[in-house]
């Protein structure tokens, strides 16, 4: 069963993050774990998808919580693409920003 949760960066294992980013070919993000962790920590919202406790997706938002909202890093493992996981991640990530402009 797939679950979608808003989390803090420290709730996601580094190894899982690297595996997810590598699975979609974004290995430039996973080469420097410190930079990846800082990027996630600087996000306004971090949403993850799990299937039977396995990390299968992630989306993050960068926002000033007033006038702008940027959807960033929407990733879904290839084995789970095409099943609505990405859509669910985007909806959950953007939900808190209903009154903010999207770019």
Task: Pin down the residues of each PLM region.
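Conserved GNAT acetyl-CoA-binding A-motif
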Residues: 90, 97-103
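Active-site phosphate/pyrophosphate- and oxyanion-stabilizing loops and adjacent acidic/basic residues
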Residues: 34, 91
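Conserved acetyl-CoA pyrophosphate-binding loop and the N-cap/start of the following alpha-helix
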Residues: 80, 84-89
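Short amphipathic alpha-helix that is part of the acyltransferase structural core
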Residues: 1-31
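A short helix-loop-beta-strand connector motif used in the catalytic cores of GNAT acetyltransferases and
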Residues: 37-48, 101-102
């Amino acid at each position: 069963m797939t679950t979608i949760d808003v989390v803090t960066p420290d709730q996601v294992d580094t190894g899982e993050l690297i595996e997810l980013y590598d699975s979609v070919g974004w290995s430039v993000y996973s080469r420097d774990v410190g930079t990846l962790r800082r990027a996630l920590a600087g996000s306004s919202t971090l949403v993850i998808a799990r299937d039977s406790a396995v990390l299968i997706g992630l989306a993050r938002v960068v926002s000033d919580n007033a006038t702008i909202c940027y959807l960033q890093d929407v990733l879904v493992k290839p084995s789970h693409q095409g099943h609505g996981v990405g859509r669910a991640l985007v909806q959950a990530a953007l939900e808190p920003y209903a009154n903010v402009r999207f770019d």
